[in-house]
């Protein structure tokens, strides 16, 4: 499933970064630099993710994604979406790998409250709602006692969701205030929502009665919905569930959720009702089901049903 959106996703990310920088420069020109003082240590706020009111669109950005602070300042990252994220500083030389939902080192907080500049620090999972089956927190704070430029990632979404903390010498004037960052972040969040709505329309053009789009993302926004959530097919016909995204996994789960939602279970080739689970459908992955009996069969994404990612297949003679 290739589209023009996939080919220009890097351009879109660059456009968001440029727009954010321009907005910050405009704020700085209007307000001037903020004085640091000599002994006062500040606490800064960064939003983790963003979302539409109905949670159908989820943002894949730290807002702001780049922040300038001074030695001994603290940053508090606030969960701003129902989708899970992490704030993770990798250890020196540690590669960024695929998210492992079975690793406590990725699910839970690791490291202390003051960053040493080279060890592994992790917020654990952050979300602004309770996420079924996962431990989660609402915020994460970390102090920065040393100068340097430090990159961090969301382990769940990988390279498409990263941020940078620039720590300067104590007493350096701040180029931007918290109000500057907040203003630019609000503008970027609105842009992410516009991108998500456009992505939803593009996915709707791809969906058919026999091909349901099981979510999608483009490196900027995620669509947490089945596109064509209700389809009608005949007995013996197939429905193909396609994850068109770049970074977000999904499931297609009929009946009761299994204890391990990440593993496939049931018989998708002869489905007449009952329990059936795709296991994880990775980005660009598919899951095909052949329906052998009439009826209305409801299903969910076991990872995102609490956001409203549900659907049904009506099977007729």
Feature map (PLM): residue ranges:
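Generic low-polarity alpha-helical segments
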Residues: 1, 22-24, 212
């Amino acid at each position: 499933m290739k589209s023009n959106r996939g080919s220009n996703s890097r351009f879109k990310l660059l456009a968001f970064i440029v727009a954010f920088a321009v907005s910050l420069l405009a704020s700085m020109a209007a307000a001037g630099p903020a004085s640091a003082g000599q002994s006062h240590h500040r606490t800064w706020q960064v939003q983790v993710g963003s979302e539409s009111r109905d949670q159908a669109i989820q943002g894949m950005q730290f807002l702001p994604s780049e922040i300038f602070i001074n030695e001994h300042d603290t940053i508090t990252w606030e969960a701003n979406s129902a989708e899970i994220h992490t704030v993770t500083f990798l250890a020196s030389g540690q590669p960024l790998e695929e998210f492992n939902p079975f690793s406590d080192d990725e699910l839970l907080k690791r490291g202390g409250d003051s960053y040493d500049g080279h060890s592994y620090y992790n917020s654990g999972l952050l979300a602004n709602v309770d996420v079924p089956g996962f431990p989660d927190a609402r915020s994460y704070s970390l102090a920065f006692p040393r100068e340097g430029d430090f990159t961090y990632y969301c382990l769940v979404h990988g390279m498409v969701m990263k941020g940078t903390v620039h720590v300067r010498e104590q007493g350096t004037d701040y180029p931007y205030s918290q109000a500057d960052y907040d203003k630019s972040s609000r503008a970027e969040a609105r842009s992410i929502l516009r991108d998500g709505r456009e992505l939803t329309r593009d996915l709707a053009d791809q969906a058919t009665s026999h091909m349901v789009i099981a979510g999608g993302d483009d490196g900027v926004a995620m669509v947490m919905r089945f596109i064509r959530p209700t389809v009608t097919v005949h007995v013996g016909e197939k429905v193909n569930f396609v994850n068109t995204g770049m970074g977000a996994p999904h499931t297609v789960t009929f009946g009761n959720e299994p204890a391990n939602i990440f593993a496939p279970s049931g018989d998708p080739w002869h489905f007449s009702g009952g329990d059936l689970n795709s296991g994880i459908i990775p980005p660009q992955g598919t899951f095909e089901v052949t329906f052998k009996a009439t009826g209305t069969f409801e299903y969910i994404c076991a990872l995102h049903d609490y956001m409203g990612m549900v659907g049904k297949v009506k099977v007729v003679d």
